[in-house]
Amino acid sequence: MIFTGTANTRLAVDVVNHLDMSLGKMTVGRFSDGEVMVEINENVRGKDVFVLQPTCAPTNDNLMEIMVMVDALRRASAGRITAAIPYFGYARQDRRPRSARVAISAKVVANMLQVAGVDRVLTMDLHADQIQGFFDIPVDNIYAGPILLGDIWRRNFSNLVVVSPDIGGVVRARALAKQLEADLAIIDKRRPRANVSEVMNIIGEVDGRTCIIMDDMVDTAGTLCKAAQALKDRGAGAVYAYCTHPVLSGGAIERIETSSLDELVVTDTIPLSEQGQACGKIRQLSCAALLGETILRISNAESVSSLFAD
């Protein structure tokens, strides 16, 4: 059985359509003071239940929704509850940098999900793989790579070079470059403060080439747009970005529209706003089939890793 909150209903509908089933019957609403109200409208006793809800903006509302949904299902005697969180919010707060007096919020969220009654977590392209270790329950972190790679293959780009937007993304970019039999370039940037970045240097040959920037998410798009400009300044023929999660906060969409970026390709782990849908440089791919197949395999106790064996 698959239930969903209000964060990304379209994706949930696409997933159940792929599986040729119907969404579970659940009422999710708000009391007059804004508190979340959830009621399960069918029998779930002993059932294998999946709750599909990304914790995207409004992050705290969507996070509270999934907590209350899980609690309602647990109290209704669901047999096993899997929190399917395509985009895992708070994942960027996964450590204490330089002993700063800050929370490790990713761990807080992991604790909350387990206390609420989640038995297993399914997510996609976690910002930091080590977050899986914050849980004492199984975590399946699947990858949008096959979706994004398939789109690149279909477009039959020539003279490709895969670009890592920073040093931390080199492993992801190198894996893509290997699959595409393409060269690798790296952008060395310095980030003076949160959500502000400055492109400093490009390592690799990009002159006259089609550049593919691969990242797990695009937030304010400051890094992405500066990277595209730096690549064009170095003679790149075209710059395309492939990012799993379209967070697109602040003035990201306007920034992308006026940037040197030729196109941004994202998945639907997070729904695009009307402004995002209207942006001619943003294109969205569906991850419903991949999520649906993963849910089916988890429910049938089959291998998930074999989906990504190649």
Curated annotation (Swiss-Prot):
Its EC number is 2.7.6.1. Keywords: ATP-binding, Cytoplasm, Kinase, Magnesium, Metal-binding, Nucleotide biosynthesis, Nucleotide-binding, Transferase. GO terms for biological process: 5-phosphoribose 1-diphosphate biosynthetic process; purine nucleotide biosynthetic process; ribonucleoside monophosphate biosynthetic process. It catalyses: D-ribose 5-phosphate + ATP = 5-phospho-alpha-D-ribose 1-diphosphate + AMP + H(+). HAMAP family: RibP_PPkinase_B (MF_00583_B). It is found in: Cytoplasm. GO terms for cellular component: cytoplasm; ribose phosphate diphosphokinase complex. Binds 2 Mg(2+) ions per subunit. CDD domains: PRTases_typeI. It is an enzyme of class 2 (transferase). The keyword Transcription regulation does not apply. GO terms for molecular function: ATP binding; kinase activity; magnesium ion binding; ribose phosphate diphosphokinase activity. Mg(2+) 2 binds at D166. Mg(2+) 1 binds at H127. Pathway: Metabolic intermediate biosynthesis; 5-phospho-alpha-D-ribose 1-diphosphate biosynthesis; 5-phospho-alpha-D-ribose 1-diphosphate from D-ribose 5-phosphate (route I): step 1/1. NCBIfam families: PRK01259.1 (NF002320), ribP_PPkin (TIGR01251). Its cofactor is Mg(2+). Homohexamer. Involved in the biosynthesis of the central metabolite phospho-alpha-D-ribosyl-1-pyrophosphate (PRPP) via the transfer of pyrophosphoryl group from ATP to 1-hydroxyl of ribose-5-phosphate (Rib-5-P). The active site is at K189. This is Ribose-phosphate pyrophosphokinase. SMART domains: Pribosyltran_N. ATP binds at D33, G34, E35, R92, Q93. D-ribose 5-phosphate binds at R191, D215, D219, T220, A221, G222, T223. Pfam families: Pribosyl_synth (PF14572), Pribosyltran_N (PF13793). Belongs to the ribose-phosphate pyrophosphokinase family. Class I subfamily.
